[in-house]
Regions:
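Secreted/periplasmic carbohydrate-active enzymes, especially glycoside hydrolases
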Residues: 1-2, 35
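Bacterial N-terminal signal peptides that target proteins for export
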Residues: 3-22
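Bacterial N-terminal signal peptides
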Residues: 19-31
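Carbohydrate-active catalytic/glycan-binding domains of CAZyme proteins
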Residues: 36-308
């Protein structure tokens, strides 16, 4: 129980001003935060990847072929390029290259769990650069029709303590799984078997900070505009492979997870969390809203400060 009490202080709005906390809880309680988070320009995207910086610009990729880019991280426009179409990508800079993961899948909703997660590299994310060229994608995770997991919704983490590269994937229709990739090739580590780390969520993202691994997942239903019930939940663990536990001691493998981002009166369906470091001491989180009532009910990119 001692560990659970400590965890509660991290995520409880009651003690947030005294203890280390995730800012999402505080932001949700402030109507002014809803205004501040609104990106401008044409921030229209679904299932955005973690935001990556390249040559002074910001990039994020979404479901379908393409994404958004920005000069300042605030005003966004279309023009990011990602071949392969597919769903729910993620991107991570490793050394001087960018690793992009995406899914080609049935997605579970129609009864099929068949799918693949693929990875590919690029030296740059700027499509105007002479160095812009994606490598041939390789399959790193798969699921079959009768499997209790969907190979979709990739999330990448390069562990800063070990240098090991991890991929989480899966949907609400089965387990969230974790596999290890080779950070030099982006391929699945030979002999590596997937580990089940959560259920009842999708669009997972992993964070490491100060001895803890945080698993962010998206709970609820998607893809139904203003009727979407997406919300973002979190648990944490001392080990990358779990168990991930929420503030009241529930394991995410048993359906637990502390809600940290929910809908508000102007936007519904927050999902697909990503965290990026702007500079030392400055962190931000990105996600989408399934429907922004002030922008014709479209799915939009949202960015907030992430305070600890």
């Amino acid at each position: 129980m001692k560990q659970n009490n400590i965890f509660f202080r991290y995520f409880s709005p009651v003690a947030a001003q005294q203890k280390l906390y995730v800012a999402a809880l505080v932001a949700l309680l402030s109507s002014s935060a809803y205004e501040a988070e609104a990106q401008v320009g044409e921030p229209f995207i679904h299932d955005p990847s973690t935001i990556a910086q390249c040559d002074g610009k910001y990039y994020t990729f979404g479901t379908g072929e393409g994404g958004l880019w920005s000069e300042d991280g605030w005003t966004w426009q279309g023009g990011a390029v990602r071949p392969g179409r597919g769903a729910a990508p993620d991107v991570l800079k490793i050394g001087d290259r960018y690793l992009v993961a995406y899914s080609a899948t049935g997605g579970g909703l129609g009864g099929s769990h068949r799918g693949d997660v693929l990875t590919m590299w690029n030296k740059t994310l700027d499509p105007k650069s002479p160095d812009f060229k994606y490598t041939e994608p390789v399959v790193v995770a798969s699921s079959l029709d009768d499997e209790d997991c969907d190979a979709i919704d990739a999330g990448l983490l390069l562990d800063p303590t070990t240098g090991r590269l991890w991929l989480s994937y899966g949907t609400y229709f089965g387990f969230i799984r974790l596999v290890e990739l080779d950070p030099k090739t982006g391929k699945r580590m030979e002999g590596n078997e997937p580990v089940n780390i959560a259920i009842d969520c999708e669009a997972t993202d992993l964070i490491y900070r100060n001895g803890w691994y945080y698993l962010l997942g998206t709970h609820g239903t998607c893809c139904d505009g203003p009727n979407s019930t997406y919300n973002i939940v979190v648990g944490r663990s001392r080990k990358i492979t779990g168990p991930y536990v929420d503030n009241v001691g529930r394991e995410m493998l048993q359906g637990g997870g502390k809600m940290v981002i929910a809908a508000n009166n102007l936007k519904t369906g927050p999902g697909h969390f990503g965290r990026y470091i702007e500079e030392e001491g400055v962190e931000k989180m990105s996600f989408h809203y399934e429907s922004d009532f002030r922008q014709g009910g479209r799915s939009v990119l949202a960015i907030r400060p992430l305070l600890w």
